[in-house]
Amino acid sequence: VAAVPAPEGQEWSEIAEMTDRNGYLVGNPDAPIHMIEYGSLTCPGCAAFSQQAIEPLMKDYVDTGKVSFEFRSFAIHGPIDLALTRLIDCGSPSQAVPLAEQIWATLPTLPQPVQQRSQQLDAALALPEDQRFVAFAETAGLLDFFAARGISRDQARTCLADAKRLSEIAEYSESYGTQDDIRGTPTFIINGTQLDGGSWESVEAALQRAGAR
């Protein structure tokens, strides 16, 4: 498979768009090798994969133009996953995967306010639907986290008040289980074939078998 140069002045890993399955596709949209990760933003296995994989995946594969990487946020852990998915969705498509990477990098500390404030979070989720996720994210400390990473508090509140978009995210996420038959996270698919392993070593080997090297 031949390399494809990126548009002048850019790397393929800086270019992203939304897909028709509510994924964030990074790289050459016409790349011959298409890799999908179904991941949860609060999944320790997804965080471990991210720490191993993201640098070589982007530099050695996506930037060649041979491989595109699509992340589909599978919100299997309820309101916290839905809120985080809406927040990575709040900026431009090119911000979504880097924001997901930063969530995974801080995952050991991120759920602490969620565990400590369960009563307040339950109260937030009982509010009208255009208020509940704003209150949930404020209580969980998520607005501070994203404000430090380029999504302002006002921008985040506006996104989290959009009940229609949150409902869309939940429906797409449900379809990953019912329609795509995804049973856990992380799950990887390369050119339509689901991989058995979840390690970077097994994913990289599959990319190479597909012609990425």
Predicted regions and their residues:
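A short alpha-helix capping/helix-coil boundary motif
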Residues: 36-38, 120-124, 152-154
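Structural alpha/beta surface segment adjacent to cysteine/selenocysteine redox centers
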Residues: 41, 47-133
